[in-house]
Structure formats: C-alpha cells, structure tokens
Amino acid sequence: MNFTKIAVSAGCILALCAGCGANDTSSTKEKASSEKSGVTKEITASVNKMETIISKLNDSVEKGDQKEIEKKGKELNSYWLSFENDIRSDYPFEYTEIEKHLQPIYTEAQKDKPDAGKIKTESESLKASLEDLTEAKKSGKKASDQLAKAADEYKGYVKEQSDQLVKATEAFTGAVKSGDIEKSKTLYAKARVYYERIEPIAESLGDLDPKIDARENDVEEGDKWTGFHKLEKAIWKDQDISGEKATADQLLKDVKELDGSIQSLKLTPEQIVAGAMELLNEAGISKITGEEERYSRIDLVDLMANVEGSEAVYQTVKSALVKDHSDLTEKLDTEFSEFEVLMAKYKTNDQSYTSYDKLSEKQIRELSTKLTTLSETMSKIANVL
C-alpha cells in the first residue's frame, strides 16, 4: 500500500541514535527531527527490538528448533502488544499492515509442525512494514465534513453493536449459569456476531480484548484465562459448564466495561478505514484457517461478522468517494455482494452457517480468494481519502 510518508534523513537517524553525552542543542535538534518524522525515539527503539526478535526467530527456523520457534513467536507477539495501541491510534494504516503479517507468524509458530517457508516469507514482509512505520508521519490533514460525518456515523454503528453485544452476552452467560448446554450453544453464536463486527475497536481498548476473546494458547504463563473461548471449550469439548459461573460473570463484567469505554470513544476517518481493513485481514488470516472457534466450529459465523463490520465502514465513507471514485465504489459494491452470495451457500438458517470442519479444501480456498480480493480493493480507500 502507498501511504503518505516522509523519509527519515541521515541527520535524523544520527540525532535519534546519539543519546550519550548529548547537549541541550543536540536534544533540541533531536526533538525537532522526531517531530518532523512523526515517529518517536521510543517507537524506533521498539521497532529495532522487534527486528532483533524476528532475526532470532528466523535463526530458530533455520535450525528446525520447534520449541524455540514457539518461544520467539510468543515473544514477538507479546512485545508488539506492549506498544501496539500507540501505533494503532497515530498510524492506523501502518498498524494494519504490521498486524497482517504478524498474525500468521504467531499462528504458525505455535503449531507442532510450523511451515518454515511461510514464517520466512511473512517475516520479510513484517520487517518491511516495520520499516514503513519508522518512516511514517501523523496525518496533519483536517478531515472533510463528509469524512467527519462518516466517522460519527460509524461510531453510532459501534455503539449499537456494543449495546446488542451486552444484551446477547447477558442471555448467553445466563444460559451458562443455568447449566443449559444446548441453549448456551445457540446463544454463544449470537453473541459472537456482535463482538466480531467491532473487534478492532475492542482491541484498541487496552486489556479488554484478551480478557474477552483470548484463546487458550494466547494466554501468557501465570495469567488467568477468561472470556468467550474458555466457555466455548467447556460447552463443546468438556460438555460440562457446572464450574463456569465465575467465568460467565467475569465475561459479562468485561463486556459491560467495553461498552462503557465505547461511549466516550473518539474515532478519525483514518482509524475507521484501517479498522475495516483489519477486519478483512482478521477474516482472511485467522477465521479462514479455523483457528478461532476450534471447539464450536462456528468460524464462518465469525468470518461473516468481520466482513459485515468492514462493509459498515465502507457504507459510511461511500458518500465521500462516489463523486470522484465511482469506479472504486462500484467495484466494492460488487465484491461485497459477491461475497454475500458465496456465503449464502453455507447458511443453514437465519443465524448459523455450515460447521467449519464440513468445508472442503477447495471451498476454503474459494472463500480465502474472495476475502483477499475484497481486502485489496478495500485498501485502495486508504489511498484516495
């Protein structure tokens, strides 16, 4: 993707690196250079740290050391989580590109037999995305009235989905606490839809996303596993929810806290478009592999919700595009429609889709191809807004 950037000059690099013995004049120059590039010393240092971890990960791949691959994959992901929120808010498009390549690396590294070629390829792309970040600058452009209105409209959509999420989670956790497994299965899928439509918003709000949506292997050693997927495992795998009342209560508490945070949320047009791209990346990277809903197998429910959330963004910015970029809006209209037609083949009723484990490799590839095409077209919005 081609985003507006400013290159970091050699003088700027020297200013950033010359920390020891710097006098007041050099400190002033360093600050000016940082402001000019838009990227702080802390971000540059964090990028350098990630590049070091990537190199060590690739060394482990070369040696075929599966334990070390898993360890470095987790370390890379954990380090990114330590500063990603600052990147998400100030550099949303660069953030999305980094996520697009980091997610498959992390997923692959956790496998018993990781694909070495895939890790290497994605690592190179990740390093390029990190380099783009170090050369990025914050947008100084004031949003047009149309785009500002679009951001407000999307915030209204997010609030509505969050409100429905609270209600659906109340019903779901109530079923869990009553011990009704079959009812819990039905209500689990309904609640997931509302969460997946606004997932990037939840991810931007600190620790709430891992509390609500972490899978078991995402939880750091010593941390407590909570949220939807802990209950999913109890319902489908263990088939015993008698001991999950505390988990249900915590999930509802966290979802309500998320809803409260969303009420005061401020969003820019850049952030909402990046969020739409992130949703499509999420669908194409984790949902399409069946990694997300490993016990319930409702991955297609999540996947469709991601696409619906992305389309909601598109519909809010469409009016700002249609006059000068009608070719792009027509293409997106067609591609969203085609994807919905394709997904309709797998719909079993108003609320559900075919279980992921019933799909053939050919069907999964077809869905993946459509998602990739849609994601690439959606990314063009970033260039024209």
Curated annotation (Swiss-Prot):
GO MF annotation: an example? metal ion binding
Q: Which GO terms describe its cellular component?
A: membrane raft; plasma membrane
Q: Which Gene3D superfamilies match?
A: M75 peptidase, HXXE motif
Subcellular localization: Cell membrane; Membrane raft
- Record note on disruption phenotype: Severe reduction in Fe(2+) and Fe(3+) uptake and in cell growth.
Q: Name one GO biological process term.
A: iron ion transport
TM ranges are: none
Domain topic, free-text comment: The peptidase M75 domain contains 2 metal binding sites, site III and site IV. Lacks the N-terminal Cup-like domain present in EfeO proteins that contains metal binding sites I and II.
Q: What does this protein do?
A: Part of the iron transporter system efeUOB/M involved in iron import. Specifically binds Fe(3+), which is produced by EfeB-mediated oxidation of Fe(2+), and delivers it to the cell membrane permease EfeU.
Subunit note? Component of the iron transporter efeUOB/M complex composed of EfeU, EfeM and EfeB; EfeU is essential for the complex formation.
The record's comment on protein family reads: Belongs to the EfeM/EfeO family.
Instruction: Tell me the protein's name.
Output: Iron uptake system component EfeM
**Source species:** Bacillus subtilis (strain 168)
UniProt lists the gene as: efeM
